[in-house]
Design a protein with these regions (language model features):
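A nucleotide- and high-energy phosphate-metabolite-utilizing enzyme signature
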Residues: 1-195
Length: 195
């Protein structure tokens, strides 16, 4: 508690990074009662730290989905894997980060991204169809990512990257729509925190 409290009171870059990692804790062994009590305390404490939440929201908006203005894919400058998309960094991370902040802001104690999104949807008056579309977008990107990893040697470089031209037309279309759902979720986050 003391460490989490310190991060909430002094939201500097290192504290924000630590929070994005450690606030997703889960019990590994034994009685869940201790972790449940810590999670309940944390959810309440974070809601009393609006500056911390706002800075976490700003951080969550730093990693944008790789869509250009005309909804074409936007590629990073990775020389080892040109014209590929990093599905972890630019695909799942926007969902995970936004879901974490929205869950903390709305008192949702879940640690899984899908459960957080559904919990926030119930509390924050997000339409059920909107939440379902966001969850489906996240799920599709995760599916592509896991399929890619399964097709490669364990530990191989580029396991989270995909060449969209290697996808069939339908999967490319769904991937664009999925990135659009990440963008929509980030827009909600920006609106909620006036960023």
């Amino acid at each position: 508690r003391a460490r989490f409290s310190r991060w909430l009171r002094t939201p500097e870059p290192k504290a924000l990074l630590n929070a994005s990692i450690f606030f997703d804790f889960r019990p590994l062994y034994g009685d869940d009662e201790l972790s449940d009590a810590l999670r309940t305390w944390l959810v309440d404490a974070v809601r009393e730290a609006p500056l911390f939440l706002r800075l976490m929201a700003a951080n969550a908006l730093q990693c944008r989905p790789p869509l250009g203005l005309l909804r074409d894919f936007r590629f990073d400058r990775n020389e080892a894997f040109p014209r590929t998309l990093d599905l972890k960094l630019y695909g799942t991370r926007p969902f995970v980060d936004a879901a974490r902040v929205l869950a903390l802001a709305n008192g949702v104690a879940h640690t899984g991204t899908v459960q957080r999104l559904r919990g926030v949807g119930e509390i924050a008056r997000m339409g059920g169809d909107d939440v379902a579309a966001i969850v489906d977008g996240f799920g599709f990107i995760q599916l592509l990512r896991l399929q890619r990893q399964r097709s490669m040697q364990p530990g191989a470089a580029g396991a989270n990257r995909i060449d969209p031209d290697a996808l069939n037309e339908l999967d490319r279309h769904i991937l664009k729509k999925s990135f659009g759902q990440a963008r929509k979720l980030q827009s909600r986050l920006a609106l909620d925190f006036r960023l």
